[in-house]
Amino acid sequence: RDVMSEVAYMQSPITKIEPQIAAKLSKQRYHLVGEHGGVKVCHWTKEELKNDRHCYKGTFYGIQSSGCMQMAPNVDTCNLACTYCWREPHSETMTKIDDDPEMLFYESVRAHRRLLTGFKGHKDVSIEKWEEAQNPKHVAISLNGEPTLYSRLAEFLEICHDHGVSTFLVTNGSLPRTIERLDTLPTQLYVSVDAPNKEIFNKLCKPKFNSNSWEQLEKTLELLPSLDTRTVCRHTLIKNHSLGYHEDYARLDNLADPDFIEAKGYVYVGHSQNNHTISDMPSHAEVMEFSRTLAPMVGREVLADRSESRVTLIGKEIIPVTLPEQKRMLPKDLGI
């Protein structure tokens, strides 16, 4: 298949993503779904299929990586321009994203299956594991873009849960009213708290449309204790920029009182290489040192870590994720 037909194959017939962005995403093995959505197979999904190695979510939360689908309802829109984001730059305009949530879920599963086709018959992949992967058990809504900009997010979460699929939603926390209004909450809500204070936030996270984004993030953190779901504050730590500042991070974490805190070292990959240097990557030892200092300041301890991902889990106890009760089956004729 030549490059242009490959790109066309990976594009949704109804996509409204700008052609230049769509072509870049397709070249990076995204399958575009709906008007603004996209799916991409995670590195760790492939690792578990081939080598029985799961990602840190397996260690921390009991997630089976081969059963995880990585997607986003809006891969092309974000209201921040974070310097450390490894994804492609997003559209400079904010269009309303209102894809039908059932269509988005089914098309995402179909795209995920298409992307896994090449693993069938691979010498290192058991047919049983490949068949299990055809029906995802977990959806990581974390691929690209800011998912709380999707106007039908609560309906999408409900449809996932009705199919017995857990949801992991990663948000930058800049839209607290949207989170507050969600009728259905994700199985686990991650809030990216990637700067210790407003000055560093504005330098690293670069709000595109709202100069009060830091204050909005603080409102989201204040909201977390009232939400009836699992919550996580995630700190992406950039050496020479945001690593350290334990007292500032402790203030934010104590405000949010999350079930878990993840401290993760910045990785010098993708688009972020335009803004950072390899010396901005902390070692796993430095992430561990940060975590051991922070943990007692928030009444928690370091529960686990994964050196290859430079990440630690801070909390009170490890509690594995449980799947929602399945009320609906995927259509038998869903196909790819």
Residues covered by each model-derived region:
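Short Gly/Ser/Thr- and Asp/Glu-enriched loop/turn motifs at secondary-structure junctions
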Residues: 66, 134-136, 306-310
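C-terminal accessory extensions appended to soluble enzyme cores
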Residues: 6-29, 282, 286-336
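Conserved AdoMet/S-adenosylmethionine-binding subsite of the radical SAM
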Residues: 122-285, 289, 293
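Short, acidic Gly/Pro/Ser/Thr-rich loop/turn segments
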Residues: 78-81, 198, 268, 321
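Short Fe-S-cluster ligation motifs
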Residues: 103-133
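Structured loops at beta-to-helix junctions and adjacent beta-edge loops in soluble globular domains
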Residues: 44, 74, 144, 236, ...
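Surface-exposed helix-capping loop/turn segments at secondary-structure junctions
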Residues: 119, 229, 299-302
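Flexible, acidic/Gly-rich N-terminal and inter-domain linker regions that tether
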Residues: 2-84, 88-93, 97-110, 114
